[in-house]
Amino acid sequence: LVGSEMCIRDRTGVKSGDITVKTASNLDKQSQSVQDYVVNHINGTEHSSTKAKTTLVVAPVAEMPESDRQYGDYARHDITWNSDASDEDEQDYAQSAQRLVSALQLAQNEGMKVVLISNTLQGYAPDMYVPMTAAEQIGELQAKELVNKLELDKASSDAPKQIEVLLPYDAADGHDAKTDTSFAQNMFKGIWKVLEPYFKDGKAASPSETLTASTTKDDWRSVAFDSSKAEQIKSVLAERLDADKDDSHPVHLDGVISCNDYVAKNIADELDKLGYTGSSADINPSISISGIVDSITGKKDLKRQAVPDPAKTSSSDDDSDSDNKENAKWPIITGYGAYISSMPNIVNGKQWMTAMENRKALADDIAQTCVRLNTSGKLSKLGFIRSATVEGKKITTIHEETLAISADNLKKTLIEPGYISLADAGL
């Protein structure tokens, strides 16, 4: 929202005094703030033409489990509630949500326009919607990046690629039996939409056998774990790889879908501890760590070659050392969130890819949209305009592709646009 404010002011010439910015830490405070603004604006504005030149840009505050927060503030969480809930907290939440919806509907009835960002509101249709990446899309994106990097289409059942999926969620306990697992479920749905054909054809397998050819999109719990503590992430991976049984014989691993950068960082730390060596750069012989650094600093471009097939297991004792060395090669690790703290691992190849919203483009798009809504109201000639069904109604939307980021495009996607500096990338 702050980015949009700057774009509205700097790129469109709107005066700072005509822009009001409010922030809130929860839905209750936000609904009160929006309600107060709308009522005060209506009471303080006599002419309907002035109201028609007012646009509210609202990013509804979503309450979510801690594991969902690991994806950052921009991942989509649709806001729903039960008006007839018996639980007091749920009643308060429903009241706050309904207050926000009522305030926005009142604004629209008075001629104001409403732009909703990321999180939809149950039963409410805005004038404009700005969707962010949903859980299913995040899962699908990472799975596709993994499939492409490992060239699973060229794999065979004789030498399947070994893949683990670590799906973080908040396990319900006695104090919180109502923990929402929908984000984790939809994340796996997106992952499995991409990976299922390869597991069925025998081109992919799971060393831990948590995923098999008979796995369905509903079997998310088979790969889910409580990610509330870093040590839990590491112990889950070690258990999957049977590291507690025999550290001297590493398990061959081609790829890990970590779901977000917080998990990816802990996965990389544990793999390092378990003796895995190299980096994802080693999977493509034409890319070295120095080559990655040179590319980011502008000295040369990267070239890609095919991913080599994993070595087949040898039955000869004489080849055991060679097998162990091959098995201990660093796998592809995916994540999401583009944490600044994860950038050094992207550069050194410990984490192959991450992803994030194109925030600068979205902020600029929102700014242009607000000015158009307050003037001509015509949006059709803007290149980023699309349409989608929101709460049963066809709504105009803003569309920007999610940025998939790896070492070979980090300079173009993050450094040149100014999201991060060379120092942030550890250079």
Which residues does each predicted region cover?
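Short, small-residue-biased leader/transition segments that mark boundaries at the very start
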Residues: 1-8
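Flexible loop/hinge segments that line or gate small-molecule binding clefts
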Residues: 70-93, 100-136, 166-168, 342-347
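Short beta-strand elements at the ligand-binding edges of bilobed clamshell
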Residues: 85-95, 122-148, 176-183, 348-360
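Hinge/cleft segment of the Venus flytrap/periplasmic-binding protein
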Residues: 176-179, 309, 338, 358-427
